[in-house]
A protein has these predicted regions:
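Active-site acid/base region of carbohydrate-active enzymes
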Residues: 2-32, 38, 45-97, 130-207, ...
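Flexible, solvent-exposed coil segments and beta strand-coil junctions
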Residues: 43-45, 102, 247, 282-289
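Well-ordered alpha-helical segments within folded domains of soluble proteins
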Residues: 57-68, 74-80, 114-126, 204-219, ...
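Charged/polar, low-hydrophobicity segments characteristic of intrinsically disordered regions
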Residues: 93-106, 153-166, 246-257, 295-311, ...
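Thiamine diphosphate
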Residues: 105-129, 135, 139
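Short beta-alpha connecting loops at secondary-structure transitions
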Residues: 105-108, 134, 183-201, 252, ...
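Non-catalytic C-terminal accessory modules of carbohydrate-active enzymes
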Residues: 236, 240, 316, 320-449
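Extracellular polysaccharide-recognition and catalytic grooves
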Residues: 251-353
Length: 449
């Protein structure tokens, strides 16, 4: 069949942003992200429109910050959070697919999986951070507390497929080695080959890390909503589980001396390590990237974090990885003609191709707005703009139609240096920080520096 067209199908998600740069492959990747997100947001955030079409919580969770840039997303996310709370188990566990059911209902043992079920807490926080509306936190606070206490309750427990961690009894009580989970998931095959044990065994490194991440988020949420005793409880849990994590990565089995980028990116992004461990992990991550030809070696959970981690070490490293066009990498997809985002890095070249319309890897677009162009909502009617030019880009720009109005940031390299252009919406202010210059306050209008 040929010669026919059909309109795209998606939920009602008004576009709220635009991004462009001198790198055409990155522009195509951004457009592909928008299309894949639209294809996968008909009433709920599905993983792909071509296979099981389930509401996978992990995909929704890692993409939420990007979705808040791309679309008017708050109402959609509030509805999905209600779905999560409706499906919450009596023990407090959020399910890993919402709504529950369908061909994958046999995977109920994966409920509570780190980075997936945590969506019930992380999505409300991301929506609050993007829009400043506390209602999603207030409406779901009790359910979020139940889930967090459920996760804390798994610490130190034994599971029938638990494997030894190498941590002694004093600190093993603060490590999560319980339940089935996905772990990092979908790392490149030459980094970490998939084994069936990935499904049936606990993943203590990933799960312990996410319990710290979870309890720290709940500490902030509890303080914001005035629940001081809850905040103290979650803060104390975060402190002791972080200590447990530091002992876990000091073992041979879970050592930071690894070429698996995810095992270094996660603790660096989540601030889980002590000072000596942090210094070592930073050096080891750069070494791991050297060994892998500065290609992307992270999996599902850590890919959205890696550019932030590299930018803290050296901004040039972040741009070097972003501009990589070889497989695995973000730009290898548009280079091969992709118009949507692939589930696996290999795309159609894989021996058994997976979905070719899977938006989750597009989560890196958050970095383009927030770091490359430097836009950040920083309170009611106020923004912070701190662009960080780099790499081989000659220009980059982004605009965001926020609930307060249109804000925009552009930079362009010229023979005389770098020119910056900023647009501030009516009745708003911006704290502008340009590289090498002190911060300055701007009122509504357009400015060029």
């Amino acid at each position: 069949m040929a010669g026919f067209t059909t309109p795209p199908q998606s939920g009602h998600l008004p576009s709220t942003s635009w991004d462009s740069s001198s790198n055409e492959l990155l522009n195509k990747f951004f457009d592909s992200t928008v299309w894949s997100a639209k294809n996968n947001h008909a009433d709920l955030p599905t993983d792909c429109p071509t296979r099981e079409r389930h509401g996978w919580t992990g995909d929704a969770q890692i993409f939420c910050p990007t979705a808040c840039w791309l679309f008017d997303y708050a109402a959609f996310a509030r509805k999905y959070e209600r779905d999560l709370c409706d499906a919450q188990r009596k023990n407090g566990c959020f399910t890993q697919i919402v709504p529950v059911g369908g061909v994958d209902s046999y995977m109920n043992a994966m409920n509570g999986s780190a980075g997936w079920s945590d969506a019930g807490v992380l999505i409300p926080w991301d929506i609050y951070a993007a829009y400043g509306d506390r209602r999603i936190l207030e409406e779901n606070y009790a359910a979020m507390c139940r889930y967090t206490r459920f996760k804390i309750g798994t610490l130190g427990k034994w599971y029938m497929t638990s494997l030894p961690t190498g941590v002694g009894p004093r600190h093993s009580k603060d490590i999560a080695n319980y339940g089935q989970s996905y772990g990092e998931w979908a790392e490149p095959k030459d980094v970490k080959a998939f084994a069936i044990s990935e499904f049936v065994c606990p993943h203590p490194e990933e799960t312990t890390a996410y319990i710290v991440y979870l309890t720290e988020h709940m500490t902030k949420i509890a303080k914001l909503l005035g629940h001081i005793e809850d905040a103290r409880e979650f803060s104390e849990a975060a402190k002791r589980v972080r200590d447990g994590y530091q002992h876990l990565v000091a073992t041979k089995k879970h050592s930071l001396d690894t070429d698996r980028q995810a095992k270094l990116v996660r603790p660096l992004y989540m601030k889980l390590l002590n000072k000596p461990q942090t210094a070592y992990a930073r050096k080891r991550l750069v070494q791991a990237l050297d060994h892998y030809g500065w290609r992307l070696g992270t999996g599902f959970l850590s890919t959205p974090f890696i550019l932030d981690v590299l930018a803290e070490i050296n901004l040039d490293y972040a741009y070097r990885l972003l501009e990589n066009e070889e497989l695995p990498g973000w730009l290898c997809m548009p280079k091969q003609g992709a118009t949507t985002i692939w589930e696996n890095w290999e795309g159609p070249r894989a021996a058994a191709p997976a979905s070719l319309n899977h938006y989750s890897k597009g989560a890196v677009c958050d970095w383009l707005f927030r770091v490359m162009c430097g836009i950040r909502v920083d309170g009611e009617n106020h923004f912070a703009i701190a662009p960080r030019p780099g790499g081989h880009f000659t220009h980059a720009e982004a605009e965001y139609l926020s609930i307060y109005g249109r804000v925009a940031s552009r930079w362009e390299k010229t023979a005389d240096g770098i020119t910056y252009t900023v647009t501030v919406p009516a009745n708003c202010t911006v704290t502008l920080t340009l590289p090498g210059h002190p911060a300055q306050e701007l009122t509504a209008g357009s400015y060029t520096f």
